[in-house]
Structure formats: C-alpha cells, structure tokens
C-alpha cells in the first residue's frame, strides 16, 4: 500500500543559519540501522580474557569488531566496546583480583595486509560498561598486556608500533598509577616494537619481553631484523639482559613467550628465523621453531622446528598443569612430549588460529579463538563446541540482487563468499541457516549476472574469479591472466623464486591484487572487465579474455627497499600476503558513455581511456595534493551525469593516514578534492553517489560512515545506533532504496528507506519541520516457527514492521505541539501515530492498523484491525 506525506505548520518563525552549523551527527541519530549478521562463519578472534574464579565469564577481543563479553560460557554475548575511537583490538587483560578492571590494547597484533590500527590503551573499572583511553595513542598495535598479580595499578604493555612505517611510540611500557602516566622500559629503535611480554607467575619482578622488527609496505613485507630479540628483567623492567644462550645466531622474526605456571623455571618460546614464505612451503621446513628453557631463560634447547606462519600469530602455550602439553597457534596443534613432536588434528573449527586459553584448574577446559570465531573444548582440544552467535564477520565487498526480498552477496576475510536475505517472513528474523556459501578462501566481490539471476560471478583472493550456477551448483573458473590467453589458475601460491620471473613459476598465475577489481559492464550484460596487472575484457561472460594493457608502472619490487634494505630469500616471512606487485586495484566505466574506462593501481597510477582501453592517459598528476604511490581504492562513476566520477584513495600503506577523495566532471581530465571538512585520519575506503539525489554522497572509511548532501563540501558522520566500525563497501538498493553497508568486523548493516537522506537539503534544514516521502508498505503475516533452539542462536534483525515515516524538527517542541495522523483516500482519520518531540530526524512506524477507539492509552493501548490495501496520507502537524 502507498502512503503520501502532508505537512501542516502553524505559527512558524524561521531563522536561516548556515547549513554547516545545522547538520550534525546527532541530528541523524533518529534513523536506526539494523544488523543482520551473519554469525554463521563468525570472524577473527585475537585475544581472550577469562575470569579464573568464574570461567563462565570471559571476554573475546576481535580484530575489528570490538570486545564481547559472556557470563554464561558463550551461550550469549554482549558487545562492550562500542563507541570508542577505534574498533580494532590487539590484546585484552582482566585483573584476576578485581575482575571489574579490564585493560584493552587496541590495534591488531597480526601483520596482515588487511590489519587495522588502534589508538592506544583503554581501561574499564566496571567490567566493560564504560571505558577511558589512558594513553599510548600513537602505538597503533598492541601485542600483549601483563598485569601485576596483586597491585591493580601496575601494568606492562607491549607496544608494537606502526606496521606501515617508522614511529617512536613503541617498545615496552609500564604504568604504576593505573595508566595515568607511562614509562618506557625497553626500546630498540623506530622500526622495532615489543610484540610479547610475560610475567613470572611466582615473582612479578621477573619479566620476559620479545622485541620485534617488522615493516609492511604496499609491495612487500619484511618480518624480522637485528632489532628482534628476547629479553629478561629481574627488577621489574628497570634493566634488561638479552637472552641468547642456545638460541640461533642471526636475525630473528617474531617471538612468542609462554611460562609454565606450575614451575616458572620452565619457559617456552616460539622463534622465527628468516625463510622465504610462500603458500606451498611446508611449515616444518622453516628455520628455528620451539625452544625450551629449564632455568628461567639462562639457556635454551631446540625442541622442534614447528612454528606455523609465525608473522601472523606465532604463540606457544604450555598447559598450566602439564609441562609436556604444548599448544601452538596459527595452525592449531599440540604436543604431548614438551614440543618434540606436534599433532595438527583435523579441525571442525576454522583452521587459522590466533589464541588459546587453558583453565588452570581443569586442563580439559580449553577455549580457542580463530579467524572463524570461538570454540570451547572439555577434552583438551579434541572435540569442540562452536559458538554460533558472534556477528563479527569481516566483509570486503557487498552487492545485491532484485529478488523479493532482495539478497545480499559479499566476500569475507578468510571466510569465503556468502549470500543471505535482507529480511525473512518469520518472527525469528534472519538466521544462520539463511546464509549460503558461494565460495571459499578469502571472499571479495560477488555479482549477479544481469541476464540470469541464478548465475553469480564469485571472487576469492588475487582475482580468483569463477562463474557459479546456483541452481545446478556448476562452477567454471574464469580467472584472466594466462600469458597464452587461456583461463589462468585460480590458486593463490606465491609465484616468486630466486632467478625465476614471477609469472613463470609454479602454475603461471598472473599477478593479481588481494582484492582484485572486476565489474560487469552497464552497457553490455555479457561483458566483464577485470584487472590483474593487466586490464582484461571479456565479451562472453568470462569464457575468453583480451588484454587492454599493463596499466602499472611495471616496477620490479625486488629493487624496492624495506627498512633500508632490499628483501631476499632469507627475509623473515618475505612478502607474506603480498605475492604480487604492482597490480590493478580499481576499475570502472562511465555509465553514460560506452568505452570510457577508469583504472587505478596499487603503485599510484590513475589512468583513463576513451576508446575502450585501446589507448590510455595517465591523469595522476591532475589530482592535486595526492602523494606518489598511493592506493587507488574505489571509483564511483555518476549515475546522473556523464563525465562525472568520484575516486576514494588511501595512503596508509605508506604510513600516511590523511583523507584523499576527488571528483571529476570531465571524464578524468581534471580532478577536485572533496575532502571538505571530513575529520582527519579517517582513511577513505569506498564512496558512492546516491542514485536519486546527485548531491548526496556516502563515504565509507576505516573509522566511520559519512554522508554529504552537497557533493562533498561538507561531511557528517552517520552513526546512529551503530558502533565504531570500518566500512569497506556499500550499495543502495535500486528498488527498495535501502542503504546496505559492508563492515569489516560486524557484518552487514542496513538503513531501510533512505528517503529522508535523499530529500535533505540546506533549504529543508532551515525549515521548522519537514515530513519526508514514505515508501510503500506491506502487511506481512510472519511465521512463528516455535522451534526449540535454545539461546545460543543468532537472530539478525528484520525491518521494523509497518510504514516507516521520517520527519525533521529544527527545534524541540512541546509534546502536545506535534501530531501525526493517518487518513484514508476519502479523508477519514484512520490512526494517530505516537511522535517524538525533540529536535532532529525521527523515524516512527505506523503499524498499518485502524485506531482502536476503546483500547485505552499508553502501554495498555491495543491496536485495531489491519487496514485494507490502498492509498493513505500521513499528516504531520506542528504548532509553535
């Protein structure tokens, strides 16, 4: 049914302040968003903090989805780190003497190309209800927090420092006053931080610290150097001695520390030493591995060379009750002979493991955090209970189809590609079983074929393209890039070796970006464009491809230095996660002019072609103020105007966290910055133009979602009921007019019916009140399936029932000065809707029922029968 809007204003008094003074984030808070999950694949857990006196209460720290708390052993979780300045967590610690005191170190401790950064240390005195930032804001990544066993004011923080560049605020820090002040106890240099710190459980003056020299660049990773080492202090950190007796000579990579709780004379470490990493290298071929000391680190013996992918999560854990039982992370494995041999059991959980906790009172009780959430075991990690209610999925890309209800397609970090409904017709909402897996690996963009809605183009890492028929289950690999024009292998082995050109090693896979770009042409439904280092075009749905040229600088990354030297085969964790460079990162076409193409790369080139890729013009220099070698992240050609396009660029991979967003009106010949008043340091990820209002822009950043109603002159954060989040992608549904948001840490969020945002303007904001257009509504007879599911059961939110009615109040008014009435086509009063009288944007729901004249008021009010389908009018009246 359709509902029109009508506004009646009585006794108006208008003032005309500037737009910039009026619009605020608070003004938009009346537009609620809903989180639909998913939780079926969960997401990356980086640390655990368990209350030992009550192990049913524990906290889970996520890579980019904040902190979650359970008080019932995982049956249910609540988010407790929602509105801070960051979403990324590296470490968490709970004070065992006073479990109300929590410490959180922000910024992932992994070194991924997708790792997010934080802004220091936070502390809570009320079990996570409120938080205070207590310093070390420029440390960016926190590896571990060690707390004094009796003095709640004493803590040690392992600050890793910037991942993408040098900085000073790194090393081991110490506070004796609860975080009011900090002293740096251990510092090597601007390239080296501290990744781990451990305190002797019997003597808090004895500390072990692992220093870690590492640097990631757009073109590679160097995970070690002379700064890495193992240190010990016996005077609470005042002085330090490097521990080397029995350890190998040479440079180290990452080191993890575990002290045997029942006998602190015994210490285990995992030690990385240089070895070229590629995905086909067996883990046990690496140098170094697991070491043990029986005399508090004075001497060491090599137990085994087992150390799975150390740059990511190299961390041993010795069972607090059994010296012979050692667990290792990244690839979950255990040893029953003090680390001489390891068993890596076939898991029913995710295989990329980050953290493990063993109950000191019962070693059978184990909790594991990995890239797929949390598992709990009661038999020492053999059988697992998977926690199914944590919606912390990390989306890279999102797309929608035109089904009813429409479906949402997306790719996730280390959890493949999935599709699920935007709503269901059941009271339970959107459930885990509503989501269907489309592909494996790391998932990225998934697009529905415009000719056949049962065909989906799915993508995994490094442009791993395939064409999937949802009805038959048939999948055809269509990755471009084979030098002879055939379909390139879709596997992601690193293709570099000494003296062997990258494209010729192994399976001859062409270079492709981690998040390889592709799109289906707006002008021809059978045409696809996709980028490796070359831009490729297919006119037969990906069955064959033609090259439109290598659009990178073609630089040889082996000639590029990291931390002042060129990497070599012995470099620790060489190029982990970046097997190819340079590559294309963004491609798009003008929606009005066939053959007008835009292409951007990870080595900083922005090029345009007006002849479908036959010739290219490098227009990078036209983007004023843009540093060299920036990452071209997203193009957004205008749906309204030919020649207009937007680009979102970021440069954090060069340790630059400024905002770079631009607009062209002439097919890329000239560009104008539209950074406007966007708060500093947000880092642009994606930008979209509204399909109905050319002045309305949506900007997804590493820290927050922003809108502009004047094409980028001014920006305001749209947060409402969402936590602090990274927004990697977004789309506006062309039929339902919903804003669909892909977050890298909390799944998918939806703002239903963005009519109010589309109709906002400086003129509207100057009015005393405004009633916005109302989308069609329908009566849904929801199914109540009454299943006995228990409470460990995630339920994504359905849209609120009824007609969504949005209105704006410039100033607050008295409660009796505002009314909202519903009339039928004959002008008869149907219902009166409860309103809110405070200033700002508001959304209220009409439940599509007649008013019950005998129902009473307040909480006892009962609704009348449903209205008949037809046309209705909403009338907002404001007196003032």
Residue ranges and their predicted role:
Residues 1-7, 677:
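Bacterial N-terminal signal peptides that target proteins for export
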Residues 7-17:
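Bacterial N-terminal signal peptides
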Residues 21-793, 800-803:
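Beta-propeller blade termini and top-face loops
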Residues 250, 262, 640, 798, ...:
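Surface-exposed coil/turn segments at beta-strand junctions on protein surfaces, enriched
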Residues 466-468, 805-806, 813-832, 871-875:
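Beta-strand-rich binding/interaction modules
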Residues 627-628, 829-866:
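Glycine-centered tight-turn motifs at strand-turn-strand junctions
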Residues 784-817, 823, 843-845:
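Contiguous beta-strand segments within globular domains
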Residues 878-880:
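C-terminal tail/sorting-segment detector
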